[in-house]
């Protein structure tokens, strides 16, 4: 029963995503390309944040003399 409820909720979120982004008007292959690009950009942003944020945080801490 819990799996069915989770699936229904996930389907509802996907439907809302399609409506908000107006992807329901696209053909399936266009939707696939758009979703692939969106996931790629999001993955690159997460990776960039993971790699470069510690350097920026340390620079800020050094600037405010929190860390020597």
Swiss-Prot record:
GO terms for cellular component: endoplasmic reticulum membrane; serine palmitoyltransferase complex. Residues 1-9, 55-68 are cytoplasmic. It holds the Pfam family SPT_ssu-like. Residues 27-31 are lumenal. Pathway: Lipid metabolism; sphingolipid metabolism. It comes from the Eukaryota. The record marks 25 as: Within the serine palmitoyltransferase (SPT) complex, defines the length of the acyl chain-binding pocket, determining the acyl-CoA substrate preference. Keywords: Endoplasmic reticulum, Lipid metabolism, Membrane, Sphingolipid metabolism, Transmembrane, Transmembrane helix. One of its GO terms (biological process) is ceramide biosynthetic process. InterPro entries: Ser_palmitoyltrfase_ssu-like, SPT_small_subunit. The chain crosses the membrane at residues 10-26, 32-54. Its main location: endoplasmic reticulum. It is a multi-pass membrane protein. It is found in: Endoplasmic reticulum membrane. Component of the serine palmitoyltransferase multisubunit enzyme (SPT) that catalyzes the initial and rate-limiting step in sphingolipid biosynthesis by condensing L-serine and activated acyl-CoA (most commonly palmitoyl-CoA) to form long-chain bases. The SPT complex is composed of SPTLC1, SPTLC2 or SPTLC3 and SPTSSA or SPTSSB. Within this complex, the heterodimer consisting of SPTLC1 and SPTLC2/SPTLC3 forms the catalytic core. Within the SPT complex, SPTSSA stimulates the catalytic activity and plays a role in substrate specificity, which depends upon the overall complex composition. Belongs to the SPTSS family. SPTSSA subfamily. Component of the serine palmitoyltransferase (SPT) complex, which is composed of SPTLC1, SPTLC2 or SPTLC3 and SPTSSA or SPTSSB. The heterodimer consisting of SPTLC1 and SPTLC2/SPTLC3 forms the catalytic core of the enzyme, while SPTSSA or SPTSSB subunits determine substrate specificity. SPT also interacts with ORMDL proteins, especially ORMDL3, which negatively regulate SPT activity in the presence of ceramides. This is Serine palmitoyltransferase small subunit A.
């Amino acid at each position: 029963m819990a799996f069915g409820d989770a699936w229904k909720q996930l389907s509802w979120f996907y439907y809302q995503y399609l409506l908000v982004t107006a992807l329901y008007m696209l053909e399936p292959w266009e939707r696939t390309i758009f979703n692939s690009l969106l996931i790629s950009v999001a993955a690159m942003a997460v990776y960039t944040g993971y790699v470069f944020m510690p350097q920026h945080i340390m620079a800020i801490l050094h600037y405010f003399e929190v860390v020597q």
